[in-house]
Amino acid sequence: MTTTYAIVDIETTGTDPKVDRMIQFGCVLVENQKIVGRFSTDINPSQMISRQIQSLTQISNRQVQKAPYFEDIAQTIYNLLQDTVFVAHNIHFDYHFLNHELVRCGMPRLTIAGIDTVELAQIFLPTESSYRLNDLAESLGIIHENPHQAASDAEV
């Protein structure tokens, strides 16, 4: 049986899933070292995005104004991730935040296996001075055109 890896990144209005909301979801599906699918979407957080987050992510309130609410795409995201291995850079944030959003919408938590690319980088690249995604991409010669955009971060 082929393993499908779901490389995920989310952007949020802040770091506390109790009060903050997702504003972007990006996922790249990989099987046998080949990209087999992609899914990304802006998400209307039903709250204002702070200037700090807008500056960091380049995601504006206007951009997400007509985007779907998380509850409208929760089932799609849940189905996409079922039977995959969840891969993220700092998985503890993305996996926890996403699960919190799913439960908030009345969905079950994800219970899939996960891999943290920060931990992998620390093991395989122990001499790096920074494990931020942007810094690692630069160090490895990977072009990262849109940092802090979920689809771009997942692709990198």
Task: List the predicted regions and their residue ranges.
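Acidic, divalent-metal-coordinating active-site segment for phosphoryl/phosphodiester hydrolysis
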Residues: 149-156
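A short, structured active-site edge motif that brings together acidic residues
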Residues: 111-121
